[in-house]
Amino acid sequence: MSKSFILSTGSYLPKKILSNNEIALIVETNDEWIRQRTGIVQRHIADEGELTSDLAVNAAKNAIEKAKISIDEIGLIIVATTTPDKTLPSCATIVQSKLKCKNAFSFDVQAACSGFIYAVTVADSLIKSHNRIKYALVIGAEIMSRIVDWEDRSTCVLFGDSAGAVIIKSEMGSSGIISTNLHSDGNVDILCTNGGVSSTRDSGKILMNGREVFKHAVDKLTASVEETLKCNNLKIIDIDWLIPHQANIRIIEAVVKKLDFPIEKVINTVDKHANTSAASIPLALDYAIQESKIKSGNLVLLISIGAGLTWGSVLLRY
């Protein structure tokens, strides 16, 4: 049976690194306070001239090089982002132009921190149903530093900028994407921006009810894992690696504890990258592969939750 297979991964981190001590010069906080509550030590920040599409293109080129394919072989480009260059056109079409990719159709997916999970699910469906798609390029890219309130210590310490990408192809065999699940609940308005094009004519800044986000994140991420296991007749011990959205170490630890899953089998990059929203999971996936943690044949579960609320999972055999 043909499955969507992740052929390669890529990532890009802006050169500028902002430490907790440097943030303490901006708002009333300190390194110990941030580490204890979030697990974050530093975050990467885009240069003034860098755009989300630039980060996306760099991650894409990294993935394309590893895949050893021609850009002209790519038939689909999906960019998951909350921070596009412009309201229109889509970030994906800008990326397509910068890559000089002539044979793809492209569009954005906006599901906040769950964006990459949503984008992979869409790509999985499209690559199976469209014969013209030989390879799909799926990117999560964010410049979250542009939509945080740098006077709000409860949110500005949490986020960073980055991009991660994967090349997906349809392939016969046991490896590949096994299942996905997506959920949303528009009634849970606990993470949002205080503006938007049609309401305030600007993008606004991030607002968050931290306590409620923690509660919902732990409950829904745990439920998403349990749903995936049930649908595939698996037990938690069958999972080789868990890659959760890199939002906060406390959320990750609470989910792992509820699942009775060994923390040693969890990919954690939140200390180095902070919360990079839709880029979080592809960035962590690329890191885990480059560090030879994830190996061929491993069963890997990706889980995420974001504003909306949106949440979901992707189960794959690498």
Swiss-Prot record:
Protein name (database record): Beta-ketoacyl-[acyl-carrier-protein] synthase III
GO MF annotations in UniProt: 3-oxoacyl-[acyl-carrier-protein] synthase activity; beta-ketoacyl-acyl-carrier-protein synthase III activity
Annotated source species: Wolbachia pipientis subsp. Culex pipiens (strain wPip)
NCBIfam families: fabH, PRK09352.1
Protein family membership: Belongs to the thiolase-like superfamily. FabH family.
EC number(s) given by UniProt: 2.3.1.180
Pfam family, one: ACP_syn_III_C
UniProt note: domains: The last Arg residue of the ACP-binding site is essential for the weak association between ACP/AcpP and FabH.
Enzyme class: transferase
